[in-house]
Amino acid sequence: MTSAETASRAAESGGTPVRPCSRPHRAPSPAAPSRPGAPAAGPRKLLVPGLPCLVRGGWPWTRPDSSPFRPAARPRMSPHRSPAVARRCGRPRRRDPRRRRTPALPRPWPGRGGPGRSLLHRHLFIQQLLRTCWPALPRDRTPAPGGTMPGAALAGPGRQASGSPAPQSEGAPPRPWTPLQPGLHHRPPSSSSGLLSSFF
């Protein structure tokens, strides 16, 4: 069948003549999906913001009221930053200049998976020491079960023990020893100020 016969048959049927294809063509592929909010590809009509406009697929699409200033802006890398991929032929990758260097020694820092967190919270640690009267209470000077210092009764009425809590009058019974002595080194913390008052 020649092209003239095809055209005559199409004219008899009332349609438009179809050109015979010499080689098969690929069907027109649909447009690539764009980013959400980007202007649609194709003829735009009725570009009033908020109204539907006709795009290539025929679907109504509402144009956003405000579009970003640089819609396709990509993050730029400065020329000083090499990518973190090790492309340097076996040599170590370049250090990120924004990352601070950790000192070389001492390597095991006191708190990298070591003892508990009491040494990290240093003020809490000091408060614990102050509450237990650590500097003023050596090992041999533990309170007696009766509640008195052991050295005060043994020293006699005239002599004071070297670590007795307070000077007493002669012949008076020894005062009960309390672990927190406010006059020596401890003051009860005041919550009015933000400072740690247990230090002073």
UniProtKB/Swiss-Prot annotation:
Chain segments carrying region Disordered: 1-116, 137-200
Listed Low complexity bias regions: 1-13, 28-44, 189-200
Biased composition (Basic residues): 88-102
Protein name per UniProt: Putative uncharacterized protein WWC2-AS2
Source species of the chain: Homo sapiens
The organism's taxonomic lineage, starting at the top: Eukaryota, Metazoa, Chordata, Craniata, Vertebrata
